[in-house]
Amino acid sequence: MEILLQLIYSGIALGMIYAVIAFGYQLTFQTSDTLNFGQGDALMLGAMVGLTLVNMGVNFWLMLPIVIAFGLVQGALVERIGVAPAIKIKSEFGWIMSTIALGIIFKNVAENIWGRDDLKFPSPLPEAPLKFLGANVLPMEILVVVGAILMMVAVEFFNRKTIYGKAVVATFNDRDAAKLMGINTGLVITFSYALSSATAGFAGALIAPLTLTGATMGAVLGLKAFAVAIIGGLTSGLGIIVGGIILGIAETTTGFYISTGYKDVPGLVLLLLVLAFKPSGLFGKLAIKKV
């Protein structure tokens, strides 16, 4: 029972990271019906920039807002270069290829700056586990869960309580109507991409002390977060959290009780089932568009 609880704790921490990254997918989808397929590389850049700052002597807690600011700039750059031109000419696939290409470029740049070897990110908290309900849990895992929740709550608060956030919601509800009301929907979309990459960079800096940090770390995490977004629903924040936790726990328990070689299988099976029987996601709403 103790081992199972530990696996659940680790799975929840991993799942919340997936959820934060998937939350970034949701932000861009809501405003522009597009996704940043380089989201995993935004996470990687956040982790690598964070590692560089920590190695330079910057305090971990001061490093986090710097990483978020870096993510904002990186995300805005992706939207301006790769997405805005595709939206302007109403290209169905241009933004897909552009975000993938930019993700590859960021990965190659990271390899040239930091090398291809994985690096150890020093933990800001003690590495000795704590006892919780009879099982061990790492302090860093607790920080990951708390940090992920705070980030998503902060973004939701911004969307609901600020004027610019309400512009984001209006653009999501009806982009054409928002434009007629004088809302600069292009700027809103740019900001949604900036916020998306900022959340991914923040997630990268949080998860880095629990794993090895390197130029390739974002590819798998980004792909799994995309699966979480599809499983939970791209229109549901709650669905993304639930989907992330389900996938995280499924991976940790499968890896321990069966084999690490099969830890990705449950999530992929669930993804296929959701796509087959509820394409809008477990908590998502089916969109109906007039043509």
Task: Report residues per predicted region.
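Membrane-interfacial amphipathic/re-entrant helices at transmembrane-helix boundaries
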Residues: 1-21, 49, 61-63, 89-93, ...
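Short, non-helical or kinked segments that cap or interrupt transmembrane helices
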Residues: 25-46, 89-94, 164, 185, ...
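Membrane-embedded helix boundary and interhelical linker motif in transport proteins
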Residues: 31-77
